């Protein structure tokens, strides 16, 4: 069979990850020719990667999205030459795999020669249309998903298809692409008498979900022999998953790939860490570490103690907290090297005397300039001593003296210490976590959720620090990883955390000086220190690692109960704030669960058709200036306040 493949690719820097070449290596076995169409840039690395499979590489302006990329490829051949192929395969880099040979799919579909076009998977449509913009239909039709669609020869030769592509208008954005192409293509040509089908049959799931490949990918891969899965699975918002599931699809998918296939998991990790927000993939994959109070693998713990270099870095300022700091250090294995900074010679002598009683490998105390507090001491004086260590922990004697009542600040310190260093077994278990996961770069305690800290947590943990963190990351450190105000950083608020020194090397190597930090008195927020506190996870990501939260098992129970209490107490007030009509709907619900369901039905990313319809109606019927005024006011009051978003 003479088969042409058209592969669409977009990546902002034009870099081609290995998951793409893995996919193309199998796809190319089933093709006679391959053309790659790149929107925007294609790096030298990317060109070399694609050149393994074809010399026909088109790099075009980044406009028109996938639709115009495909159109460009079709136009480059012309209909006469395209008509010589038995099949034309159009696919793109939103898919990962395969987990089984693609030939199985091509052979199976070749048995049905009555089809004019076919695809990999189906979207079952919806009674309403959730996408904004001008709608061809007031509902979402059942359709072949555009990530993999195949045209047969007689379909390519048909005037209808040729006119469709010849007259395709420029595509403005994602919603325009869906409305003019993906969601309507199947129905438009079915209505004209053309026959179609999909390889992965999911008619039995149409009452289960409208999007099987995203909501139940494991079922499709295991039971329906689907060879491919969505890259989006790992970065899809957890809130969207929670509209349809308990959040389990991605964890199940990963377990299936790990335990039942030969698919190289490194291909997923490398792409996630390079291109995705850890806030999304760490939640979807349940990467938060819950640490038990007893050692789980004694043999491994002993091996780590014998063969790995372990360091504890501490900044000690408050001598009335020295006993607490010693108790923290006493939980570390005796092979640990401890590096301590303080601001006065008298304090140094007191610390050295106290720590001499602890069974540690070495203790080094340094007097440093009292500028930049714990963050300045860590980067300027302690970090240079940590090069060459495998695993390290940083802590300081935290006193949130500006927080009233004092119990709120003290509990912040409890959250940090309880989850980073609950006991000696906790420390060994954390070391095993790093040993078992080569991509783990940082483990941070969770953001405090009590007192006034709760509202900061609800705002994503940025406070007034998004712009200064972004500037530090992009301009000062010149690191290129995803950062957005709508994505919460998995950061060590309180500056107590575990890390691999290699993961923070781009930050450590900057050459920090105490003059980089403002003198006392420091503002309560918005300083370079607060930006550094939030930049740690992004630095680790740029170095090829990911950050995750860590909790002791006891605190995880507390955290769960805390979140349950907040959810119960806030659902109705939130409903009143967001939308009066929603409030009355929620207040009429018989239970808290029903109220939650009502709110998610209105505000959930997929089940929010009423909200989307209202927004679309406003956009379509109001003057542009009036519509923008309404949306601007809404965003100013209720958010979202940062980054790309939909209302």
Name the predicted role of every residue range.
Residues 1-647:
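ER/Golgi luminal nucleotide-sugar-dependent glycosyltransferases, focusing on the catalytic module
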């Amino acid at each position: 069979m003479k088969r042409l493949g058209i592969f669409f690719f977009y990546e902002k820097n034009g870099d081609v990850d290995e998951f793409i070449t893995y996919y193309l290596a199998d796809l190319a076995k089933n093709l006679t020719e391959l053309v790659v169409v790149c929107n925007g840039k294609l790096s030298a690395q990317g060109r070399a990667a694609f050149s393994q499979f074809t010399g026909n590489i088109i790099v075009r302006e980044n406009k028109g999205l996938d639709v115009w990329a495909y159109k460009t490829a079709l136009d480059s051949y012309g209909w006469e030459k395209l008509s010589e192929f038995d099949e034309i395969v159009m696919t793109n880099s939103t898919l990962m795999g395969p987990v089984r040979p693609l030939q199985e799919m091509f052979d199976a579909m070749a048995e049905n020669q009555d089809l004019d076009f076919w695809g990999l998977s189906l979207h079952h449509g919806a009674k309403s249309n959730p996408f904004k913009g001008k709608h061809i239909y007031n509902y979402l039709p059942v359709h072949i998903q555009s990530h993999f669609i195949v045209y047969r020869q007689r379909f390519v030769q048909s005037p209808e298809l040729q006119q469709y592509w010849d007259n395709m208008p420029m595509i403005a954005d994602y919603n325009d692409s869906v409305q003019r192409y993906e969601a309507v293509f199947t129905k438009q040509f079915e209505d004209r008498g053309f026959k179609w089908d999909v390889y992965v049959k999911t008619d039995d799931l149409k009452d289960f979900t409208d999007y099987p490949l995203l909501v139940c990918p494991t079922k499709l891969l295991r039971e329906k022999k689907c060879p491919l899965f969505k890259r989006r699975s790992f970065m899809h918002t957890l809130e969207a998953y929670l509209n349809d599931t308990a959040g389990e699809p991605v964890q199940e998918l990963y377990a299936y790939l790990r335990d039942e296939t030969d698919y190289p998991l490194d291909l997923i990790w490398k792409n996630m860490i390079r291109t995705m927000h850890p806030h999304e993939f760490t939640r979807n994959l349940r990467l938060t570490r819950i640490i038990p109070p007893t050692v789980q693998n004694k043999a491994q713990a002993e091996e780590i103690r014998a063969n790995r270099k372990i360091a504890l870095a501490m900044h000690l300022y408050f001598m009335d907290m020295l006993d607490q700091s010693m108790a923290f250090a006493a939980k570390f294995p005796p092979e640990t090297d401890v590096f301590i900074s303080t601001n006065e010679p008298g304090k140094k002598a007191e610390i050295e005397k106290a720590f001499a009683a602890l069974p540690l490998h070495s203790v080094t105390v340094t007097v440093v300039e009292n500028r930049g507090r714990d963050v300045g001491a860590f980067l300027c004086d302690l970090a240079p001593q940590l090069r060459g260590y495998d695993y390290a922990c940083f802590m300081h004697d935290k006193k949130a003296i500006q927080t009233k009542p004092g119990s709120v600040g003290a509990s912040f310190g409890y959250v940090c210490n309880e989850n980073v260093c609950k006991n000696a077994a906790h420390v060994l278990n954390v070391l095993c976590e790093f040993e078992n996961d080569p991509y783990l770069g940082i483990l941070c305690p969770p953001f405090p959720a009590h007192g006034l800290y709760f509202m900061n947590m609800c705002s994503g943990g940025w406070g007034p620090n998004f712009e200064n963190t972004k500037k530090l990351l992009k301009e000062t450190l010149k690191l290129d990883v995803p950062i957005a105000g709508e994505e919460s950083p998995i950061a060590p608020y309180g500056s107590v955390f575990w890390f691999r020194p290699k993961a923070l090397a781009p930050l450590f190597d900057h050459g920090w000086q105490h003059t980089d930090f403002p003198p006392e008195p420091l503002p309560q927020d918005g300083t370079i220190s607060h930006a550094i506190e939030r930049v740690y996870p992004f630095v680790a990501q740029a170095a090829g690692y990911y950050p995750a939260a860590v909790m002791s098992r006891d605190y995880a129970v507390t955290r769960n109960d805390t979140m349950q209490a907040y959810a119960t107490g806030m659902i109705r007030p939130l409903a009143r704030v967001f939308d009066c009509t929603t409030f009355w709907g929620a207040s009429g619900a018989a239970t808290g669960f029903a109220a939650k369901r009502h709110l998610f039905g209105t505000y959930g990313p997929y089940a929010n058709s009423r909200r989307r319809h209202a927004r679309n109606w406003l956009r379509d019927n109001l003057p542009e200036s009036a519509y923008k005024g309404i949306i601007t006011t809404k965003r100013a009051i209720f958010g979202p306040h940062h980054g790309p978003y939909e209302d």
